[in-house]
Amino acid sequence: MPAEANQVIENIKLIPGGEELVNKAILSLNRSAEDAVKEATPIFKNAIRNMSIADAGKILFGPDSAATAYLRQTTYQELKTAFAPKVRASLDKPLVAGVSTNETWNTLSDAYNKVANTMVAKIAGLKPVNISLEEYATQKALDALFVKVAEEEKAIRTDPVARINEILKRVFGQLDKK
């Protein structure tokens, strides 16, 4: 959950059944990311197919994160566009009693913000929560995807066993000869 949601979450947990609701909402956020990540493969394949010889050379002989940086630069916006509807659909699935994670978040954050916007709450240091759960989940899914890509890239560059096909063996094998 977004850090901005901590005050809301802590108060929800005080309500009977609130902790279960929070846990289900977190699970729903995780599932939304899993649903969205499936969209990455064709987008990555397209970026690799459209790679120039110069780009390939920069990746091969560049820093350990060159491939990850290339994919982030060439696919990020397209991935974000592809992920957003998947994340939204997942967060719109019924969570408890036919109410979705998005509906629950919007209701709770609206109620919290009504309190947080009062003079007493401002004096007490409460701040309104203004974050889109969909945008947050989409961003976190993209962050996690590129962390995984970076881990795979590091393995391919440093461990010949991670080079699972002939192309990877032939291309990245050149690094072993240095």
Locate each region found by the language model.
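Mature, extracytoplasmic segments of signal peptide-bearing proteins
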Residues: 127-130, 134
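Extended amphipathic ligand-handling, pore-lining, and cofactor/metal-binding catalytic surfaces
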Residues: 104, 111-127
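A cross-kingdom marker for long, charged
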Residues: 134-178
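N-terminal Sec/ER secretory leader and immediately downstream segment
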Residues: 1-36
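Hydrophobic alpha-helical segments of membrane proteins
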Residues: 82-90, 94, 115, 141-148, ...
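A contiguous pocket-lining binding segment that forms or flanks enzyme active sites
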Residues: 64-111
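Extracytoplasmic beta-rich ectodomain segments of secreted or membrane-anchored proteins
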Residues: 22-70
